[in-house]
Amino acid sequence: MPDIRLQQYTDFPVSFAIDFVLMSDGTLDDTQALATAVIVALGTNRLATPTDLLPEPDSTDRQGWWGDLDAEEIWNGWPIGCRLWLLRRSKIIGTEAMGGATVTRVEQYIREAIQPFIDLKVASDMDVKAVRVGVEQINARVRLYRGPAIVVDLQYEVLWDELIGQITTSYAAQPIGIAPPRPPGPY
C-alpha cells in the first residue's frame, strides 16, 4: 500500500498529472491509501501475457514493470498494473465478435488488476461494472468492500480517441459518493 495519497489533476483529454496531497498542517495526506493503491493498479501497464495480441502489430513491447518479473518469489508481491493498455487500438464491439465484447474485456482486465487486494484480504469483495457510453466511450465503476462497507468507490472513464489513437483515462481519485452498505451476505 502507498503511504501517501495521490490526487490527479486533469487537462482532459490531452494529458494528466498526479500529485501528492497535503493536509492543512503541511504533512502528506495518507488517508486514502487503499484508493491510491487502486489508482496505481489500474493506471499502470501490466505485462501482457504471451497469448495477448499487442495493439501495435510490429511491436514486441509487452509493457509491464521490471520489478514484477519475480515479485512473488522475491518480496511476496504481485504483478502491478492493468492490461487495459492492450485495448488502445480496439474498436468497441459487442458480444457477437470472436474476441468477445470490449466492455467485457474492460471488466476482466480491471478485475485481474484488483484481484490481489481480495486474495490478500485487503478487501473482502469487489464490484466492477463497465458500460458503453456513446460511440467512443466506456465508463467503469470500481468498488471495493470490507464486509458490507464500501471502502473504495471510483469512477473510470476510458475513451477510445481515433484522432490520437491512444487510450486516455480519467480517474476520480476520491470516493465519488457515500453509498449505503451492502446487505449482509456471504463474502
Can you say where each PLM-predicted feature lies in the sequence?
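Short secondary-structure junctions
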Residues: P116-S124
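Immediate N-terminus of the mature polypeptide
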Residues: M1-E112, S124-Y187
